[in-house]
UniProtKB/Swiss-Prot annotation:
Gene3D superfamilies listed in its UniProt record: 3.40.50.970
Binding positions for Mg(2+) per the UniProt entry: D227, N256
Gene: PDH-E1 ALPHA
Alphabetized UniProt keyword annotations: Chloroplast, Magnesium, Metal-binding, Oxidoreductase, Plastid, Pyruvate, Thiamine pyrophosphate, Transit peptide
Chain positions recorded as pyruvate binding sites: H115, Y141, R142, A190, I192, D227, G228, N256
Annotated binding of thiamine diphosphate, by residue: Y141, R142, A190, I192, D227, G228, N256, H325
The species this protein was found in: Arabidopsis thaliana
Protein name: Pyruvate dehydrogenase E1 component subunit alpha-3, chloroplastic
Reactions mediated catalytically: N(6)-[(R)-lipoyl]-L-lysyl-[protein] + pyruvate + H(+) = N(6)-[(R)-S(8)-acetyldihydrolipoyl]-L-lysyl-[protein] + CO2
Amino acid sequence: MATAFAPTKLTATVPLHGSHENRLLLPIRLAPPSSFLGSTRSLSLRRLNHSNATRRSPVVSVQEVVKEKQSTNNTSLLITKEEGLELYEDMILGRSFEDMCAQMYYRGKMFGFVHLYNGQEAVSTGFIKLLTKSDSVVSTYRDHVHALSKGVSARAVMSELFGKVTGCCRGQGGSMHMFSKEHNMLGGFAFIGEGIPVATGAAFSSKYRREVLKQDCDDVTVAFFGDGTCNNGQFFECLNMAALYKLPIIFVVENNLWAIGMSHLRATSDPEIWKKGPAFGMPGVHVDGMDVLKVREVAKEAVTRARRGEGPTLVECETYRFRGHSLADPDELRDAAEKAKYAARDPIAALKKYLIENKLAKEAELKSIEKKIDELVEEAVEFADASPQPGRSQLLENVFADPKGFGIGPDGRYRCEDPKFTEGTAQV
């Protein structure tokens, strides 16, 4: 049965689940351009030998991986019922949470910039639900849903958005800086590209623990960032280092085609970001980011490679945000027809259709999940609203390593609690 979730065509001379050590990978052939940048591009690579003679390597596609899995499982489906319901619940949580954030922002419960993730849920769910708790995720300013997918509670994320002490950063991080040590959510970053070096460092730490300290560590790191980041220096520097040291990291480009108000096609000399992977000696893959099952299959291969010590992968997920850049953006620059085209490809609606048509779930089961998530999000709002504001003295906590430094006076009290502090007459 033909569906929107037909296996994506992704080809490479070095399969995602294979080794490419000591090979120079260069792109040599692209599929013909199409009107939809998100149509699947085949990736063909060549290997150069010492005599500079060009020789074609075997091409392995994701379809072959999918067929092998289907023959092993004696089924034509890519997921089980349990997996499908888990994916659906996570995507519904992300969408419902962000919709509620919009309501709370316009009611004055949130302040500053708030960037929502509506439309991009297939990317977060497709990758993060394959990870373990000890794996790390590094995000951007559009980080609420990444945190939720990684296991941070809706209460903790909503409270952080409300600026309350019960938030995952005790109310000091806000929308763009979700962090949880418990869940290895290593932060959202307000400046584009700033999270990529952090993610590369986390991956280096995993490799060091395994190879130098001889610890039983197969942790991987997933770094999320947008198309607008891919012209920044940190991106290229970290691709180089990750390939050089064969770090267990997956670089995930959430290409939503717009960097604030700048079209991706106007901002870069070559809009096909995935090609930058082979330039540094790692697989580069382009996948339909509106399709959670396609994303998931690619993610499986990339994560497996990283766990086996075979190095990094660059994955370009072409997706689309259904709202403006932030809640302060009236979204007047994007063409209405373009927005309508992508809205018709809603990843949640597509997954719902797939689950029902393949008899993996009934309408009533999915409605039950939606109801449960609505109640969970509403309860998170009530919890956040009732939570206390952080005390002013908290501003100086966790800033200085010396507990008797600037933040705390000789009497053991925080200096900012001294009335003279606010008067500007305190001796510091």
